[in-house]
């Protein structure tokens, strides 16, 4: 295979350059970057923007000249000041900032130290650009379009940005309140320039980068002013280079590989010996611990202490005295372990332990083993960790699942592999550095793998440290040639993934994706093992190689190691193929651009930053400012009270094929609820003084919700809260409502663009838009400009799809991003850690949603004399009784004879449904509780939901995990809630006396 990166043509700086942004890097945010020791070394704010052109040429662009800023609302008493008095107070404040000190608190190791600090450090005067007065509106609460005087603090560096932020935070008690200091300056730059953070930009005025500190491995390295970067509309994605990697490791004991070994395994083995009843003394301890450096210490036929592998030659004359010194402590721990019985319930209740002193939980036993491990690790020689034996890498380019390059780096020899580069190394140190060099040559835009945030990257980092090559391995691992990357350990809590600890390399210019985390976030699966994911989504089951087989084959021949290599490359390629199949790049690029955050954020950050950036942009456009609200500050008096969530109507079970079924579905219920009642922070009346009676321009709507306290069975209603929201008579909406309207409208328009046709006239001119036939003419409507064009058919040369399949995929991903973002906005308003958290709006949204559902139900039942019911799918092997031409049959759905055709309109928004098909039988009727009913259509589709089999006295039913069942009281329960003995509600037929007998086959036919 040819190497995927080619030499780029020489840069012509006189020509415009266009590229798609892939990543953002802020040097001042880099904790590994050397801190300036003097003011002269301190740089002004820089942004590095990485991207790729339409020809696959990589670009690094340093953007200079942008000045970060935030706002401060002065004490309320200042609002009453005249302009002259306000100006005087401002001058006094500026003098204080420029000349004075303030008291700071330094916290370390749980201790606080107070000290005085100069507000603007000596020599950094130029980093403070200005402190001025501006007029803005407050996002937090309805103020009837009132402008307030705010202090705008503008700086030239991130260091000064944080300095001023800390200073004004110390002035909270004086009444100063910060606004938007929690918005990263580069996000604000994105907002101001109307740039899509993963979109296309054009730069006309630039020069080649000449600062070695910013030299990268990109094809073009350029420098420009922040005003020269402009957004452009390009409806495709650049040919991004996507690399996937996987590591294979050895294990000295045949168990799970450990990168840095201590004596935990020895401690566990000693615990087993202790529990077997063996007595310990100092000599026995010394014998065991000295033997394990040569061979297993065999205690009995089934009990041994495994051999260990020290880094260096063991000098027993040194370690023996250390063992004897600590022998008493070791014996004490082992004696305690030998006298316990383990309580598998892991019950830590103090009373129970006191009543049964010999009982110990698994957790408590692990603590004892950990103490023993600490002693052994302290006195005994350091051990070798389990080595990385192979690193596989595969590459594909966006737009195709074809693997354009394969590489395997192997410890020791490895046979050649067709269409793959095989590199054999004599040491693990060489192996790691070879892979680092490969990354430099490949220069991927995207680096992916499976569980790399949970295993691979941390393992590689530890092995680099153990081999004493961490600096060489990490330097230039990203795109900057001189920058040293680091392993980031990040704790992330989100609704999609729960609590997680991510461990990854902070690679500048390279977007790192752990496919496992994406699958866990976006899909519900029985198992998230790679082979199961591959089988579900691409129908390809990988050739598995068990861990013990890997360990055995590595010790074998070059051919054996080639088997491991093929397995490793296979895993890498599966990741590439799944990324392509599930359109992960399209979906996440669309989401990044909708929410105005970098692509990297979607894989390493929670939901909050996405929505916050979007809201901040809309606030900026409408001259509103968002206060910095920490949870303790924004808690209202009733905040600890709960509120009622969504409503679920009880289903009326049955198969409804005789009468037509009409589905009533709100288009995005919660967003629609918020739009309908203008539920937005800037329209929520918090201060009655702004609610003007008989205002000619504004009406006011009261929305109430029930307050609850307690949970579960103890939950009870404790009151009702009424909230007032401003309603503009001219149809204007609040900021949140406006955002939702925009998102839903853009989604609708984006979906329509997928249907665009290009009509080319005979004179070669062309028109794009939604095409409809009007007799002898075509009518073309263009969504962007609203123009309608009519063209006679006789003047038309051709009619073709405007967009190709790749472009349609981008639009499809974009419309999905609009939908998800609209639904996520409500969630962030109700999330206590969110910068826009406001419980009253979240509660009013759910209250309105419940009202809308009940309103629709009552309307249908009152005006159309209809029933509101629910339905669910059944498994294909479910038997049904049906008839055709007066002949009765009992058969399963999967055995129905007929022509199955694609049915894409069924549940289009359900990501868990694949390959939808329909079958429309002719003159077929099915038996229902209402008699014989004609079958309109039968629909079948794959699902990735769990299937539960529920057995009852009447038979069994197989249902999906979210299927609604009714308990004996008629309440809805899910299959997961069913236990043995749970009573379900049955619908039994009416029995009547009848003396005629039928045979078994007839009985089966009649059900």
Language-model features: locations:
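DnaQ-like (DEDDh/DEDDy) 3′-5′ exonuclease domain used for proofreading
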Residues: 2-443, 570, 576-593, 600-645, ...
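Common nucleic-acid-contacting/processivity interface regions adjacent to the catalytic cores
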Residues: 2-9, 202-206, 551-688, 694, ...
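Core structural elements
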Residues: 45-55, 123-126, 131-133, 138-139, ...
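Conserved catalytic core of nucleic-acid polymerases
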Residues: 167, 175-195, 666-669, 675-680, ...
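Active-site-proximal helix-loop-helix substrate-binding element of RNase H-like nuclease domains
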Residues: 402-409, 414-430, 443, 447, ...
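Short glycine-rich phosphate-binding loop at a beta-alpha junction
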Residues: 445-452, 867-870
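Short active-site loop/helix that positions an aromatic residue
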Residues: 456-466, 667-681, 903
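HINT superfamily self-processing domains
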Residues: 873-1006
